[in-house]
Amino acid sequence: IISYFFTALLIIQSYSCSSDKNKVTPPNLVVFIADDVSWDDLGCYGNEYVQSPNIDLLASEGIIFKNAYLTTSSCSPSRNSIISGRYPHNTGAAELHTMPPIEMISLPEILKSNGYFTLQAGKFHMGDYAIRGFDEVHDDREVNGKGGEEYWEKAVENAPNDQPFFMWFASYDAHRAWGENQFTGTHNVDQIKVPEYLIDGPETRLDLVNYYDEITRFDHYIGEVVEKLKEK
């Protein structure tokens, strides 16, 4: 069985019941995090122009939050808050690129101490305290690819079968600078709507389609992971 929880970040939970009716196997947990993707630039949040079919499907089968907010709209402070459960002003790292204290506890560290295999793949950008919580860290771009997602499917495939796992999959998509990828051309400059707060010109439209193409790449790898989880 695979169950889903969805918000600006995405968590997939898969679990199974053992033959003992009184015992439930601990759930496997997978977290997906995009980089610099606005909440309303996904189909499930009403954007009719971006192609995000895998995320949209998960959202339709799970829970979607429509009243959730950031306290700091910045990369590393948000990551540290998500993985620690603390507000940015309580992590010691409310500013971009600042590191929390080494003694801070993270979710994967707690899970690891309770028998979970823990793995990170893609963009890290959190601090040494968070490394302590992972059995494996794969933050090399040569391994993960330009979008940070290419190792994800293999990580699931290689996950141990004799213990539950927690996987933290963080992409570089759709952070600037945008470059060509296998999904370049998915979106057309003449077939999108420019938000009212932006100047509707050729440069803006080109920026938007390049941005949308990287969202589609992120979405594609989420679909690959979901299929691999079903096989596993």
What are these regions, as identified by a protein language model?
Residues I1-A8:
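Sec-dependent signal peptide recognition
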Residues F6, Y15-K232:
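Formylglycine-dependent sulfatase
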